[in-house]
C-alpha cells in the first residue's frame, strides 16, 4: 500500500497560509490575564472532560457571565482554545470570550464568557417547529461559515455545544476546546468530536480531513431534529458507529470512499460491517415527525451526510439551499425594516463539550463541599454564601 491519497479543503484552503504566522501559531501566543477578583461564582452549571463550568457575576458591572475552569491539561491546548476564541471574537453566533483569569497561587486558568440563557436541547428539540429547525440550522451555518472562512475547524459540533436562548431566538456555538487551525496537507488527530457526530473520515482513521468534518456533524444534528431520533446514528463504540452509518448510507458507497482515498480499513470491520443497501430517507418519516420533514429537508440532509468529505456541501453552499429560502427571505425583510443591530450578548447553561446537565440547583449544602468549589476557591474567585442557591 502506498498510503492514503491526500485531500485538501474545497474552500478556504489557504486562509492560514496567507495570514501572518502569529494568527495561527498559538504556541507562541502570549496570554493577557485579567483580574480574577472581578468574578464571583454563583452556581455550578456542569462539568466536562476538560473543565468545570459555573455561572458567575462580574462584580464590576453586575453582569452574569459563565466561567469555564480548565482542568490540568497541556498549556498548548489551552493556548489553542484561547487563540481561536480571540481570532473569532465578534463573529456571527460565536460565543464571546470576555476575559481570561488565573489564580496566582494555584495557576488554574479560567475562561470567562458571555452568559447564554440556554434551554436544555433534550427538552427544546421536542418542541421545535419545522420553521424553528430551519432558523436555528441557518444560525449555526453562519457561525460555521465564519469560523471556516477564518481557517478554523470546530471539530465538536453537537447539540451540547449549541446554546439556544429560545425566547430571544439567539444561538451561540460554544466550546472551542477541540477546534484547530486548518493547514492543507496536514494530518490531524482523529480522536475528536463526540461519537454520534464523528464523520466517517474519523472512524476510518483518515487524518487529512478539513472543515467538511463539521458539516457531517451538522447533518447528524439535522437528522436527529427532523426525524425526532436522538442521536440519529447510535453506535455503542467507534467501530459500531461506522456500522450504524453503513446501515443507512449503505456499504457500497463506503467501499467507494475508502477506495478513492486508498484507506486501509481496520480488520475489526471485516466481521461487523456486513453488506447493507442504501436506505431512502423517507423510511425514517412517521406520524410523529412528518410535520418536520419536507422534500427540501431530505435533499439538504442527503447533501450533508455523504461518506466522501469532498462531496458534502460547504457551510456557504448549505446556506444557499432551498431549505433556507423562507428563513433568508424573512431575515432580509427584517433587516430592511429595522436598523441592523450588532451581535447582542446572550446568556448559558451547559457551556462546553460533554457537560452533563445539572439539576435545578439546591441550596448550597452539598455544592459547597464539592471539590469543584474547592478548586474554584483556590482559584481566588470568592464564592458568595448563596452560591448554588435558586435564583
Swiss-Prot record:
GO molecular function, one term: kinase activity
First-level EC class: transferase
Activity modulation comment: Constitutively active protein kinase whose activity is not directly affected by phosphorylation. Seems to be regulated by level of expression and localization.
Interaction with beta subunit, as annotated region: 36-41
Domain of life: Eukaryota
One of the Pfam families matching this protein, by short name: Pkinase
Modified residues (Phosphoserine): 362, 370
Family to which the UniProt record says this protein belongs: Belongs to the protein kinase superfamily. Ser/Thr protein kinase family. CK2 subfamily.
Main location (coarse class): nucleus
Gene transcribed to yield this protein: Csnk2a1
PANTHER family: CASEIN KINASE II SUBUNIT ALPHA, CASEIN KINASE II SUBUNIT ALPHA-RELATED
Catalytic activity: L-seryl-[protein] + ATP = O-phospho-L-seryl-[protein] + ADP + H(+); L-threonyl-[protein] + ATP = O-phospho-L-threonyl-[protein] + ADP + H(+)
Protein name: Casein kinase II subunit alpha
Gene Ontology biological process terms in this record: apoptotic process; cerebral cortex development; double-strand break repair; liver regeneration; negative regulation of apoptotic signaling pathway; negative regulation of double-strand break repair via homologous recombination; positive regulation of aggrephagy; positive regulation of cell growth
Biological role stated in the UniProt entry: Catalytic subunit of a constitutively active serine/threonine-protein kinase complex that phosphorylates a large number of substrates containing acidic residues C-terminal to the phosphorylated serine or threonine. Regulates numerous cellular processes, such as cell cycle progression, apoptosis and transcription, as well as viral infection. May act as a regulatory node which integrates and coordinates numerous signals leading to an appropriate cellular response.
Keyword line: Apoptosis, ATP-binding, Biological rhythms, Cell cycle, Kinase, Nucleotide-binding, Nucleus, Phosphoprotein, Serine/threonine-protein kinase, Transcription, Transcription regulation, Transferase, Wnt signaling pathway
Amino acid at each position: 500500500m502506498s498510503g492514503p491519497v491526500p485531500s485538501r479543503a474545497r474552500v478556504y484552503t489557504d486562509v492560514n497560509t496567507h495570514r501572518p504566522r502569529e494568527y495561527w501559531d498559538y504556541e507562541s501566543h502570549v496570554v493577557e490575564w485579567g483580574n480574577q477578583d472581578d468574578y464571583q461564582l454563583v452556581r455550578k452549571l456542569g462539568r466536562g472532560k476538560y473543565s468545570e463550568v459555573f455561572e458567575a457575576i462580574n462584580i464590576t458591572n453586575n453582569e452574569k457571565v459563565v466561567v469555564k475552569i480548565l482542568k490540568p491539561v497541556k498549556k498548548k491546548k489551552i493556548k489553542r482554545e484561547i487563540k481561536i476564541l480571540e481570532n473569532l471574537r465578534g463573529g456571527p453566533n460565536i460565543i464571546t470570550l470576555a476575559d481570561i483569569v488565573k489564580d496566582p497561587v494555584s495557576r488554574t486558568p479560567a475562561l470567562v464568557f458571555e452568559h447564554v440563557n440556554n434551554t436544555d436541547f433534550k427538552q427544546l428539540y421536542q418542541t421545535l417547529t419545522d420553521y424553528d429547525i430551519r432558523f436555528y440550522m441557518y444560525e449555526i451555518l453562519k457561525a460555521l461559515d465564519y469560523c471556516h472562512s477564518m481557517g478554523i475547524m470546530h471539530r465538536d459540533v453537537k447539540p451540547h455545544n449549541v446554546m439556544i436562548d429560545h425566547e430571544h431566538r439567539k444561538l451561540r456555538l460554544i466550546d472551542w476546546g477541540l477546534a484547530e487551525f486548518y493547514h492543507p496537507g496536514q494530518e490531524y488527530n482523529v480522536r475528536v468530536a463526540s461519537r454520534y457526530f464523528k464523520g466517517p473520515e474519523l472512524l476510518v482513521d483518515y487524518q487529512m480531513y478539513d472543515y467538511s468534518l463539521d458539516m457531517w456533524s451538522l447533518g447528524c444534528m439535522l437528522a436527529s431534529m427532523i426525524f425526532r431520533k436522538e442521536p440519529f446514528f447510535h453506535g455503542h463504540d467507534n467501530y459500531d458507529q461506522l456500522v450504524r452509518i453503513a446501515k443507512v448510507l449503505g456499504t457500497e458507497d463506503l467501499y467507494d470512499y475508502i477506495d478513492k482515498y486508498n484507506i486501509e480499513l481496520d480488520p475489526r470491520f471485516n466481521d461487523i460491517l456486513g453488506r447493507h443497501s442504501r436506505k431512502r430517507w423517507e423510511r425514517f418519516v412517521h406520524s410523529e415527525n412528518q410535520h418536520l420533514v419536507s422534500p427540501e429537508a431530505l435533499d439538504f440532509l442527503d447533501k450533508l451526510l455523504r461518506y466522501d468529505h469532498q462531496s458534502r456541501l460547504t457551510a456557504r453552499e448549505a446556506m444557499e439551499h432551498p431549505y433556507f429560502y423562507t428563513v433568508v427571505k424573512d431575515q432580509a425583510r427584517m433587516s430592511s425594516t429595522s436598523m441592523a443591530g450588532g451581535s447582542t450578548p446572550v446568556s448559558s447553561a451547559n457551556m462546553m463539550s460533554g457537560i452533563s446537565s445539572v439539576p435545578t440547583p439546591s441550596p448550597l449544602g452539598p455544592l459547597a463541599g464539592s471539590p469543584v468549589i474547592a478548586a474554584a476557591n483556590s482559584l481566588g474567585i470568592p464564592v458568595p454564601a448563596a452560591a448554588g442557591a435558586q435564583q
